[in-house]
Amino acid sequence: MAEETIFSKIIRKEIPANIVYQDELVTAFRDISPQAKTHILIIPNKVIPTVNDVTEQDEVALGRLFSVAAKLAKEEGVAEDGYRLIVNCNKHGGQEVFHLHMHLVGGEPLGRMLAK
């Protein structure tokens, strides 16, 4: 079994977070250090450390990440103008918490993906 993370405690509501969506498969909450006007983290309730650890058994939960992202983008008013979904993987990818998570960012022009 994967190690416990700070996100595990958010899922169980053991530490405070601004949860905007939660069901049996995923939890979504506002980032504590937002990088855009809208910045929400969407995570599977099961600890999956990185994208490299995804298995076929995770497909339903990971599909739910995307359907929840679309729902939240509409609710947040960013769906029409556009937004970005970001999943970082491991150190060089910028992953800081080793519990797979998707960033939904938007609400303003986001610029280029990567600087040259």
Curated annotation (Swiss-Prot):
GO MF terms, alphabetically ordered: adenosine 5'-monophosphoramidase activity; nucleotide binding
GO CC terms of this entry: cytoplasm; cytosol
GO biological process per UniProt: D-alanine catabolic process
Chain sites annotated for binding GMP: R30, D31, I32, N88, E96, V97, H101, M102, H103
InterPro entries: Histidine_triad_CS (IPR019808), Histidine_triad_HIT (IPR001310), HIT-like (IPR011146), HIT-like_sf (IPR036265)
Keywords: Hydrolase, Nucleotide-binding
SUPFAM superfamilies noted in UniProt: HIT-like
Main EC class the enzyme belongs to: hydrolase
Known EC number: 3.9.1.-
Catalytic residues as annotated in Swiss-Prot or TrEMBL: H101
Role description: Hydrolyzes purine nucleotide phosphoramidates, including adenosine 5'monophosphoramidate (AMP-NH2), adenosine 5'monophosphomorpholidate (AMP-morpholidate), guanosine 5'monophosphomorpholidate (GMP-morpholidate) and tryptamine 5'guanosine monophosphate (TpGd). Hydrolyzes lysyl-AMP (AMP-N-epsilon-(N-alpha-acetyl lysine methyl ester)) generated by lysine tRNA ligase and lysyl-GMP (GMP-N-epsilon-(N-alpha-acetyl lysine methyl ester)).
Family per record: Belongs to the HINT family.
Protein name (record): Purine nucleoside phosphoramidase
Species name: Haemophilus influenzae (strain ATCC 51907 / DSM 11121 / KW20 / Rd)
